[in-house]
Amino acid sequence: MRLRKLVLTALLVAPLSCLGANNDQLRDIMYADQADRQVAPGPDQWKDISKRDAARRVKVQAELAAGRVKTSADFYNAALVMQHGDTFEEIRMAHALATIAASLDPLDRSARSLKAKSWDRLLLWQKKPQWYGTQYVRHGNGKWALDEIDESAVTDADRIELAVPTLAEAKKQVGVMNRAK
């Protein structure tokens, strides 16, 4: 329920996005989130990263509750952090925030891409196949694969519109990832 209130608050302040500057604290939180993922973390490192992720999500929720998420960049930064959530509600919030970011700035390829990625992640959390083909999984044998995809859900034109690879490009990426191993 608390997450729902935060999303509703975010939706109410979204029209005010043209009135403020980007939130530097949210930007810094997002940079820290991404810095943890720059070098492929080993299994032992994920426990510490998960703790830092949880702390960052608390900070993002505080910024949302305080009404300090106003611009497309703010919503994008918040969404990127929230998509590393541990619960369905956090992933759903990430998708809502990414959708707002993409709506506020339809020309922002990163926001449109995150909208597709967060949707795929949300579907997978519900044990449903992803639509856009943005989520990869590493099997016990160390090989990468695309997580299950409903290939009939969207077209490659839809994927291009949301700035994600076509299905053929996503499948090709699996080979690249496995060769880089």
Q: What is the predicted function of each stretch?
A:
Residues 7-8, 18-19:
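Cleavable N-terminal signal peptides
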Residues 92-107, 136-137:
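TPR/TPR-like (Sel1-like) alpha-helical repeat modules
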Residues 14-16:
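N-terminal signal peptide c-region/cleavage motif recognized by signal peptidases
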Residues 60-63, 67, 101, 108:
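Alpha-helical solenoid scaffolds that mediate protein-protein interactions
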Residues 1-7:
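Bacterial N-terminal signal peptides that target proteins for export
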Residues 71, 112-181:
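Terminal, low-structured helical/coil segments at or just beyond the last alpha-helical repeat
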Residues 47-59, 88-91:
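Helix-turn-helix repeat elements of alpha-solenoid scaffolds
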Residues 22-43, 70-84, 108-124:
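Amphipathic alpha-helical repeat scaffolds of TPR domains
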